Amino acid sequence: MLALIQRVKEARVEVATVVVGAIEQGLLVFLGIEREDTHADADRLLKRVLAYRVFADAEDKMNLSVQDMNGGVLVVSQFTLAATTDKGLRPGFSSAKAPEEAKVLYQYFLDSACANYHKVAAGEFGADMQVSLINDGPVTFLLRS
């Protein structure tokens, strides 16, 4: 399981021109689910996402997590993160979990996030989404479960 996290000043996701999720300062989390991923992977990755220190403290060092600074978390499913890109000129998606199974694991991750943190918003799994954000930094990290 992969989480591409971006520190943002704000972010929102729309489906068919309707805003389905939005946050102010916090983390935008693009979540990629691979074929072998399990609930345990989701638990491990969520713990890291919520505790990963990417926000500046009083000394301007990255010492604060999204929880420490009471920021928002916007979770967006993105199967393209699981793509194989090492050969050729077209991505392959055989390493991504099948959509039906991925949706269940995505929902588990999202439900766990909501149960463990109070400022969680989300996109819509499998939808054609438009994601708008203002990067802060930019600061972007790829986390693996």
Model-derived features: where do they sit?
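C-terminal or internal capping secondary-structure element at the end of a domain, subdomain, or sheet
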Residues: 125-145
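Short, surface-exposed recognition loops or helix-turn segments adjacent to catalytic cores
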Residues: 62, 119-130
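Short Lys/Arg-rich amphipathic alpha-helical segments
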Residues: 2-119, 136, 140-142
